[in-house]
């Protein structure tokens, strides 16, 4: 299984959250996990207790963390983030060559990346995927307003031309929710019925309200750089991943303590002391940052339509008060 943040929620947050897993390999740098020695070495399968049944397995259409947490094992983007939130290449060979006017991005793909269907990834797959993302993804639609064209240049080249300079382009392509996933062009449909990506796991089966089953992709084309955040080398240490919906947080806690789950997502912080006293069955990891706190003002009507008042509120309520 990918060791680089495989099961973490996608965004670091500003409040403490708890998770628990049975393996160091499952631990990621977001929220609280409890990991134990059982999964620290390669093994055949793992059961992962998630907060709900995913509404869809289409990571473009949904911005839900749950969907991305599962399907980031199946699909990969052109770019992603390292541990310091710098944009780094994933399916792209390197960062793009940007024209002097900031309008043209020339992207070269890694050679020999295998799709789950058994053939190599080509530029046509990337173009078709990005066009679908622009049409279907909430994030992609916003980016699409800035894009003049997306074209393949040979087997491994992709050119994105913008209408005007757009600084967030690479970050938007790297975001792991509503993500710009790259898929085999022949699998593209709405809704998706075939999940053909390049990730370290391939989709095997979904039984609604029971599980989503992923199996290791033995021909996975990993990057050579060391794992770093979402970037770098990803390794599938476990043969099968079974994601099960367990909406009740207390059930996730008890299941983790009983050894029923190898990983349990988003547990109440109040469970920390029990997990710490589990006799080595679980190893909790607490991250005090989880989520993005922000204020939203109604600028159309009411007292906060006044910009000076909004600035006063912003000054009075600094980041410390929001945390």
Region spans (language model):
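Surface-exposed binding/hinge segments that line
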Residues: 41, 108, 142-183, 191-207
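A structural "hinge/loop" feature
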Residues: 52-68, 91-93, 119, 168-178, ...
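Aromatic- and charge-enriched surface segment that lines or borders ligand/interaction sites
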Residues: 94-139, 153, 159, 255, ...
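Extracellular/periplasmic solute-recognition and catalytic clefts
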Residues: 149-151, 204-213, 244-301, 311-312, ...
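Aromatic-rich, solvent-exposed beta-strand/loop patch
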Residues: 116, 161-178, 196-248, 272-291
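N-terminal lobe/hinge region of extracytoplasmic solute-binding protein
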Residues: 49-100, 131
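N-terminal export leaders
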Residues: 14-18
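Alpha-helical secondary-structure segments
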Residues: 47, 122-129, 155-157, 199-200, ...
């Amino acid at each position: 299984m990918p060791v680089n943040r495989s099961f973490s929620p996608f965004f670091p947050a500003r409040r403490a959250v708890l998770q628990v897993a049975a393996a160091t390999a499952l631990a990621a740098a977001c929220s609280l996990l409890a990991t134990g020695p059982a999964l620290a070495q390669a093994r055949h399968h793992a059961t992962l207790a998630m907060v709900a049944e995913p509404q869809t397995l289409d990571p473009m259409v949904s911005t839900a963390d749950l969907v991305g947490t599962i399907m980031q094992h199946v699909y990969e983007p052109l770019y992603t983030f390292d541990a310091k939130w710098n944009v780094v290449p994933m399916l792209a060979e390197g960062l793009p060559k940007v024209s002097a006017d900031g309008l043209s991005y020339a992207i070269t793909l890694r050679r020999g990346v295998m799709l789950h269907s058994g053939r190599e990834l080509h530029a046509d797959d990337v173009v078709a995927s990005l066009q679908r993302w622009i049409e279907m993804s909430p994030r992609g639609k916003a980016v699409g307003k800035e894009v003049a064209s997306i074209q393949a240049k040979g087997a491994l080249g992709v050119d994105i031309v913008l209408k005007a300079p757009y600084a967030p382009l690479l970050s938007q392509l790297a975001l792991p929710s509503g993500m710009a996933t790259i898929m085999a062009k022949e699998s593209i449909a709405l809704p998706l019925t075939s999940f053909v990506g390049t990730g370290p796991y391939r989709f095997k089966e979904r039984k609604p309200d029971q599980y989503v089953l992923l199996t290791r992709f033995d021909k996975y084309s990993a990057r050579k750089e060391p794992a770093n955040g979402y970037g770098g080398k990803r390794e599938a240490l476990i043969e099968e991943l079974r994601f099960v919906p367990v909406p009740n947080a207390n059930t996730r806690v008890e299941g983790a303590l009983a050894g029923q789950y190898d990983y349990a997502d988003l547990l109440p912080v109040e469970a920390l002391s029990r997990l710490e006293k589990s006799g080595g069955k679980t190893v909790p990891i607490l991250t005090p940052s989880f989520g993005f706190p922000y204020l939203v003002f109604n600028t159309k009507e009411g007292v906060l339509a006044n910009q000076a008042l909004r600035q006063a509120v912003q000054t009075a309520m600094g980041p410390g008060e929001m945390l």
